[in-house]
Amino acid sequence: MLFMGACAGQKAVVEAPKPPPPPSATVVSLSLGDVFFDFDKSELRGDARDQLQTNYRWLAENPSRKLTIEGHCDERGTNEYNLALGERRANTAKDYIVNLGAAAGRINTVSYGEERPFASGHSEDAWAQNRRDHFVAQ
């Protein structure tokens, strides 16, 4: 777009700024995702390993950020047992990410046991959603 103006008999031509180029189609946005566990287990499933690799890449691409891994359980079992199981789950995920190359000091763990369910209800579907590690960026 051109703008023309007159000043003391002189004509000036001023070009409007060009719009920025469109973003590259190769930009990939990685985000943190939860990992899920089988009943009464802290071993990683295949889908959990895949998500942990994505979470590791996010951490590698954000060197100024830290993570907290929250270990969670379903409502079955005692509070003490579930706190210990949640801790094992969080530590298993941390160990996996550290083995991929992350600095251990950038990752904290905490267990909430059954205290902070994601899904309400008393069904296998609800319990499966609550047996998880949740990742919080800091």
Language-model features: locations:
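Sec-dependent bacterial lipoprotein signal peptides
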Residues: 1-5
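Periplasmic peptidoglycan-binding/tethering modules of Gram-negative envelope proteins
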Residues: 7-66
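Short aromatic/hydrophobic contact patches that present stacked aromatics
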Residues: 34-37, 82-84, 134
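Extracytoplasmic/secreted proteins, especially bacterial periplasmic and envelope-associated proteins
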Residues: 47, 51-54, 80, 84, ...
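A non-catalytic structural micro-motif
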Residues: 63-72, 87-118, 131-138
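Surface-exposed aromatic
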Residues: 73-78
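Short beta-alpha junctions and helix-cap segments that line functional grooves
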Residues: 120-123
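A generic structural micro-feature
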Residues: 125-129
